[in-house]
């Protein structure tokens, strides 16, 4: 018994929308790699700032900053 494989190809390219036209330039650089470090340093700066933000939030949650003078009671 033979098996027949039929290749189905789609002839429609999809609908062109105004949102797609706006977003297309953002995807035009896909696959290209910038030489050197690129924006790695900028990313590291924002990661460090985010880490500082998280530490501040943690310290506030633990009542170890700004809340030292307040009595906290769960009763």
From Swiss-Prot:
Stretch forming the signal peptide: none
Classification via Gene3D superfamilies: Photosystem II reaction center protein H (1.20.5.880)
Keywords assigned by UniProt, alphabetized: Chloroplast, Membrane, Phosphoprotein, Photosynthesis, Photosystem II, Plastid, Thylakoid, Transmembrane, Transmembrane helix
Cell location: Plastid, Chloroplast thylakoid membrane
Post-translational modification comment from the UniProt entry: Phosphorylation is a light-dependent reaction catalyzed by a membrane-bound kinase; phosphorylation occurs on Thr residue(s) in the N-terminus of the protein.
GO biological process: photosynthesis; protein stabilization
Protein family per UniProt: Belongs to the PsbH family.
Description of how the protein assembles with itself and partners: PSII is composed of 1 copy each of membrane proteins PsbA, PsbB, PsbC, PsbD, PsbE, PsbF, PsbH, PsbI, PsbJ, PsbK, PsbL, PsbM, PsbT, PsbX, PsbY, PsbZ, Psb30/Ycf12, at least 3 peripheral proteins of the oxygen-evolving complex and a large number of cofactors. It forms dimeric complexes.
Record-given protein name: Photosystem II reaction center protein H
Organism name: Zygnema circumcarinatum
């Amino acid at each position: 018994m033979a098996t027949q494989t039929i290749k189905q190809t789609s002839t429609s390219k999809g609908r062109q929308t105004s949102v797609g036209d706006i977003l297309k330039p953002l995807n035009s650089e896909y696959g290209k790699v910038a030489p050197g470090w690129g924006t790695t340093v900028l990313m590291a700066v924002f990661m460090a700032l985010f880490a500082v933000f998280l530490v501040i939030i943690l310290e506030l949650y633990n009542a170890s900053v700004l809340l030292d003078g307040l009595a906290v009671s769960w009763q």
